[in-house]
Amino acid sequence: MNIVYALTSNFVELARPSMRSLLEHNPKAKIYLLTETDTVETDIPMTVINVSGQTYFNDRNCVNIRNNFGGYINLLKVCYPELLKLNKVIHLDADTIVCDSLEPMWKTDLKGKWIGAVQEKQGHYKPFGPVYYNMGVAVLNLQQMRNDNAVPQMVEYLKAVRQPFADQDAWHKFGLPDKFVDIPLRYNENFATGKTDDPAIVHYCGISDWYYNPRMERREYLEKYR
């Protein structure tokens, strides 16, 4: 099972609880960290990949790159198929806690598809059609994306159009309607997707100062691994 995080080095500490919880429930998982340095001080076994020299978004004069909401590392999420010579990965945001085995999620049948993810609830942001998926947790078929030459299309799109959710919007622009597969809600419980009685992944997206917020719902999951 391949798990990937894309973070600037100053955010790695915030992701440590996510990684600890992942390995407790999935001890054989292999973690890849895409960041802007060669080394990261951590006690968690991982493969660190320095993406600072990549040329995909090196045009600093491009206003849509310079002012991107999520920054350079966030933009590079769409380049996973080229940066990671793997067939398949699970992407996790830093603000997640894993509460169970991810094997069933990992085994999602993505034949011919790009992405397995959880849909956000009706009424949320949907600029590309009737559905929108939360990409903070996603199973990604990197080999199929390479077969479909997806990366150049998404990179050029993000250079030309500044979208509020960058990588997430690019995946939807080119992946809808037929490149997504629905996975169960329990693999990405958050304010946008809904709640479940048996979460496998709790995702604290949309919560102000989530790492320190004492009134945050499901805080007990985070506290266990801090």
Kindly give the residue locations of the regions a language model identified.
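A glycosyltransferase accessory/donor-loop signature
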Residues: 1-17, 33, 135, 140-226
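A structural signal for isolated positions on well-ordered beta-strands in alpha/beta enzyme cores
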Residues: 2-4, 30-33, 47, 90
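Short, acidic, metal-binding catalytic loop of nucleotide-sugar glycosyltransferases
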Residues: 21-29
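Short internal beta-strands
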Residues: 31-36, 117
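Short, polar loop motifs at secondary-structure junctions
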Residues: 35-40, 102, 121, 186-189
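Short loop/helix-cap segments at secondary-structure boundaries that form the rim of catalytic
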Residues: 39-45, 107-110, 195
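Active-site-proximal specificity loops/subdomain of glycosyltransferases
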Residues: 41-83
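GT-A fold catalytic core of metal-dependent nucleotide-sugar glycosyltransferases
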Residues: 73-122, 128-132, 138-140
